[in-house]
Amino acid sequence: MTEGGETLTIQVVIQAVAQRRRAGMENRREEFLKTVCQIYMAAVLVVLPLYYIPGNGYDKLGDSKYYLYRNISLICMGICLAVQIIAVVRSCRMENSSSSGMYMRKTEGKIIRWCREHSVVTAVCLYGFCALLSAICSSYGRTAWVGEREWYMGAVTICLMVGGFLMAADYSGQYIRILYLGEAASVIVALIGLLQKLGYDPLGLLKGYVVGDWEYTHMLSTLGNNNWLSGYYSVMLPLSLSLFCKAAEEGRRAASILLGGGNVLVVMMLFLQGSDGGVMVACVTLWICFWSSRKKNGLWEPLLVLLSGACVGMLLWGKVMQSRGTYDILLQDGIARKMAVWQGWFLLAVVCLLFCGIHYALPEKKKRALQIGALCGSLLLAAGVIIWYILKL
């Protein structure tokens, strides 16, 4: 072998070793970032909803939850950002300086192609950019960046949410266990709130408050304000119902029963918590589940059973509340009182079960027609209820 051939062979070996080393470093970096993201998701989905300071009740609950969320977000996102910057610097150093222009053009092309393929992520990034621009141009100063006390929805929080979304979208992987843990946390939150409606206060959060106090009717569970609770379930209920539908579609009975029971408690909590927005969240989410499941065999029956279970639960919970004399816990100016004493829950549960049996017995073509009719009828009914409600105000 000539000297030139030996030199070429050595260069090929060196390049192969360097490429293998680079691939190993890339894999370790990805695994590390996935671990950080897993910790972040567990903290946000599991720890944050259940977090409270024993003995403080609802005093400064919003502040303590915000500081926990802010600190966890800054730590996890800071770690991910630092690792990414180091990786980019190393990648730039490995590139030949003579081909830096070509490298930049390739990178620019990749970014444009990536934005086209990830339209949702691009839209979220633009939303964060608009929030930053709004805070910079605002005359409110610190309030535009931080927000008000116990309502820290300024540009900083929006950017933290955008960063959390990007981190979860890139590095979350298939961490289904964390989603199930988040579902369990949401069920615990709902159960604590439902027990409070019966006069039980397992965590002592209502200690010191009496009937007539604003906190007694508006604050519940470990989330506090009923509007905060509705906002929390506007995210968690679609996730919970999607897990339930997936378990039912795959034929996992035990998981379907557990997830179905949890969803029943969450729907009941939204009906009784006092915010009309929470009732709308529950109804719209259930309707979307029925709509998206219309072409999938065997999903409408579990959803109808879940809905009938929620109706029976509402009937029983309302009866127990009246017998225990805890009816005054419900808001006087909301829809919760009407929900608690409505006598049509049993009839609605029977209708759901009858519809389930008829739907199960029909052939596929007639099932589709029945589904479309039920969905359109429910929309007309909802429109009628909304019009009646507006005219009554």
Where are these regions (language model features)?
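Charged/polar low-complexity intrinsically disordered segments
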Residues: 3-6, 11, 15
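Membrane-interfacial, low-structure loops and terminal tails that flank and connect transmembrane helices
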Residues: 10, 17-31, 90-118, 330-332, ...
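Alpha-helical transmembrane segments of multi-pass inner-membrane proteins
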Residues: 25-51, 73-84, 128-141, 154-167, ...
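Membrane helix-loop boundary segments at the extracytoplasmic
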Residues: 51-60
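Perimembrane loop-to-helix junctions flanking transmembrane segments
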Residues: 59-64, 210-214
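Hydrophobic alpha-helical transmembrane segments in multi-pass integral membrane proteins
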Residues: 60-133, 341-351
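Membrane-water interface of transmembrane alpha-helices in multipass transporters/channels
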Residues: 60-61, 148, 299-301
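Non-cytosolic membrane-interface motifs at loop->transmembrane helix junctions
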Residues: 63-65, 145-154, 333-334
